[in-house]
A protein has these predicted regions:
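N-terminal Rossmann-like NAD(P)+-binding domain of SDR-like oxidoreductases, especially those catalyzing
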Residues: 1-161
Length: 161
């Protein structure tokens, strides 16, 4: 089994698109972006025959990536709702993306033994962790970090922050 694919969720956002650009230049991996384009942009897509863009939601990641699952080396998960102020205004969208969608990504990685690289935030790590309950965004990110630690303990899930 050749694991020659890297997945980037949120691949048309600022961080994801810059990571894809870097990976395309510095590695030989095939790269697949999964993005719902809620804050990402088609303008950030890179024209390269090793890069594929899939429009979709992380809540359906198992369905979207099922055909690639045996060839995926790692998943960089940047495809979350990432606005502190807006997480109060769009609470349901924040929970759907950061809790439900992210848990689907975690489960897909766990089930298929794929290493996860998860994007943390100063909203949960800053101020010695005391700010983790200040917004729905920070709360969901803090709970996801806690869940990852437990998935590692319980199931030896491989991840990096």
């Amino acid at each position: 089994m050749k694991r020659n694919i890297i997945i980037v969720t949120g691949g048309t956002g600022f961080v994801g698109s810059n990571l894809i650009s870097y990976l395309a230049k510095k590695t030989k991996y095939k790269i697949i972006s999964v993005d719902n384009y809620s804050s990402g942009s088609k303008k950030n897509e890179i024209n390269n025959n090793r890069i594929r863009y899939i429009k979709g939601d992380t809540k359906q990641i198992s369905h979207l990536l099922n055909r690639y699952k045996n060839n995926i080396n790692s998943i960089f998960h940047f495809g979350e709702f990432s606005r502190i102020y807006q997480s109060f205004l769009k609470f349901n969208q924040c929970i759907e993306s950061n809790s439900i969608g992210t848990h689907e990504v975690f489960n897909f990685c766990l089930k298929n033994k794929i290493k996860l690289i998860y994007s943390a935030t100063s909203a949960t790590l800053g101020n010695k962790g005391k700010d983790k309950d200040l917004s729905p965004y920070a709360f969901t990110k803090a709970k996801n970090l806690e869940l990852l630690e437990n998935l590692n303990k319980w199931f030896n899930m491989k991840f990096e922050i």
